[in-house]
UniProtKB/Swiss-Prot annotation:
Residues passing through the membrane, by range: none
Record's protein name: GDSL esterase/lipase At1g58525
Molecular function terms, GO-annotated: lipase activity
Subcellular location: Secreted
Family of this protein: Belongs to the 'GDSL' lipolytic enzyme family.
EC top class, as a word: hydrolase
Domain of life: Eukaryota
Length: 349
């Protein structure tokens, strides 16, 4: 009898160790994501917008080499985080018409390339605003209740990890259309306040474990370097980076206050410093190129300009921080996720 108990204990220990190794966390039923292209896994595919990438060479390093609508050579952070949580290797786009009810259980992404906290951003780009993403989230919860019951919906709301990722399109594009109303500082503050309002609304809908990404050093993406960084030097667009820093300076303490005010956990996730350090010191992270993308010549190549007719696309995208002139490669995303996820998840679960 003692031997049987000992063997059972060893089996349980082995199972638990394997679960940890595989990234399985039974306390996290799903990953729910809102935001822009960083987390979009194909929601724009059927929209009347030019901001699409469901064609080669996008997806060349994705399983099967499929161009699924992810703005990368492979997977994006929503996929990588879902895998790290032990949920799935890829996170489905909510707008995917082939989704079955059971596909909703591990989570979805509502993210749409080109959107932002400023409602004008999505309107200009003809994409899904973050506010409309909340409407789709309500629909998602209704589907969960209908197919799997109230208790399952309650479990997803209370224990899932919710991620909100936006601001780059607002800062880099929409500000130019709003400059008659705001200076750079006041616009960054407006965006941060809008982000806090979004989190409040998400919390009202039942979400209790929410992480919000900081703005990134969008002034250092290859396209910004090419257009604003000087013809020969191609340095970062520092005024744009300063706007991102102002957004972060406003957002971080506001989310800390919200975390104290509301039940659950609300986290500010500092992505800016990690990505900026990668761009400034690429060799430190195993990259060769940080100032241009792999696709095409990597200077202004994005969306339809990054296509299979372009003969200049690199053969080894993992040596580049950026895949196209705006979006990181899968390997760069993996470095960011590995550097940040465990640190912040430990504050939630």
């Amino acid at each position: 009898m003692k031997l049987q108990i000992l063997l059972l204990a060893l089996v349980l220990i082995a199972v638990e160790a394997n679960a940890v190794k595989q990234g399985i966390n039974a306390t996290i039923p799903a990953l729910i994501v809102f935001g822009d292209s960083i987390m979009d896994t194909g929601n724009n595919n059927n929209l009347p917008t030019l901001l699409k990438c469901n064609f080669p060479p996008y997806g060349k390093d994705y399983p099967g080499g499929d161009a699924t609508g992810r703005f990368s050579d492979g997977r994006v952070p929503s996929d990588l985080i879902a895998e790290k949580l032990g949920l799935a290797k890829t996170l489905p786009a909510y707008m995917n018409s082939y989704l079955k009810p059971e596909d909703l259980l591990k989570g979805v992404t509502f993210a749409s390339r080109g959107t932002g906290y400023d409602p004008l951003t999505a309107k200009i780009m003809s994409v899904i605003s973050v506010w409309d993403q909340l409407i789709y989230f309500k629909e998602y919860i209704s589907k969960i209740k209908r197919h799997f019951g109230e208790e399952k919906a309650k479990d997803i709301l209370e224990h899932s990890f919710f991620l909100v990722v936006s601001s780059s399109n607002d800062l880099a594009h929409t500000y130019l259309a709003q400059a008659h109303r705001y200076d750079r500082t006041s616009y960054a503050n407006f965006l941060a306040d809008s982000a806090v309002h979004f989190v409040r609304e998400l919390h009202k809908l039942g979400a209790r474990k929410i992480g919000v990404f900081s703005a990134v050093p969008v002034g250092c993406v290859p396209l910004q370097r090419t257009v604003f960084g000087g013809f020969f030097t191609r340095g970062c667009n520092e005024p744009l980076n300063n706007m991102a820093k102002q957004f972060n300076a406003r957002l971080s303490p506001a989310l800390d206050s919200l975390d104290k005010e509301l039940d659950g956990v609300i986290l500010y996730i500092n992505v800016y410093d990690t990505l900026f350090d990668m761009i400034q010191h690429p060799k430190k992270y195993g990259f060769d190129v940080a100032d241009k993308g792999c696709c095409g010549k990597g200077l202004l190549t994005i969306s339809y300009l990054c296509n299979s007719l372009n003969p200049f696309t690199c053969s080894n995208s993992s040596s580049y921080i950026f895949w196209d002139s705006y979006h990181p490669s899968e390997r760069a995303y993996q470095v960011i996720v590995d550097n940040l996820l465990d640190k912040y998840l430990s504050k939630v679960y």
